[in-house]
UniProtKB/Swiss-Prot annotation:
Subcellular location(s) per record: Cell inner membrane
MF annotations from Gene Ontology: mechanosensitive monoatomic ion channel activity
Subunit structure: Homopentamer.
Protein name: Large-conductance mechanosensitive channel
Transport keyword on record: yes
Pfam families listed in its UniProt record: MscL
Encoding gene per record: mscL
Source organism phylogeny: Bacteria, Pseudomonadati, Pseudomonadota, Betaproteobacteria, Rhodocyclales
Domain of life: Bacteria
Main function: Channel that opens in response to stretch forces in the membrane lipid bilayer. May participate in the regulation of osmotic pressure changes within the cell.
């Protein structure tokens, strides 16, 4: 079998195509969540906390002081951008929650397979008769 034919069979399997669609939808969903956090959630939280813009919260590890994070970045100062970390953490939590809800819904929609029937229980009389038979065969 040629390399190209093997690759075509691999690529056309349902699982590979499903995975590709999932990756594309996941990337688009990530952008939506990023916008939700940066443009809707964090401004509301910032407003409730006194007008804080989390994107611009940082700790300057350098010796000089700067008026803005952008000025410190431009000067090459070492920064701990904990505000962006907070945004990214909230992104993750929203995505994780959405995936949890989706998986839970999918599992609920799947029909669970009925459990296998229990093995038939042998009556004591049948066991006793088998033992007698086996003993008679031996002796």
């Amino acid at each position: 079998m040629s390399f190209m034919r093997e690759f075509k069979e691999f690529a056309m399997r349902g699982n590979v195509i499903d995975l590709a669609v999932g990756v594309i939808i996941g990337a688009a969903f990530g952008k939506i969540v990023d916008s939700l956090v940066k443009d809707i959630v964090m401004p509301v939280i910032g407003r409730l906390l006194g007008g804080v813009d989390f994107r611009h919260l940082y700790i300057n590890l350098g010796d000089q002081t700067y008026e803005t994070m952008e000025a410190a970045e431009k000067a090459g100062a070492p920064l701990v951008k904990y505000g962006q970390f907070i945004n990214t953490t909230i992104d993750f939590l929203i995505i994780a929650f959405a995936i949890f809800v989706a998986v839970k819904a999918i599992n609920r929609l799947k029909r669970s397979e009925p459990p296998p029937p229990p093995a038939p229980v042998e009556a004591e009389e049948v066991k006793l008769l088998r033992e007698i038979r086996d003993t008679l065969k031996r002796g």
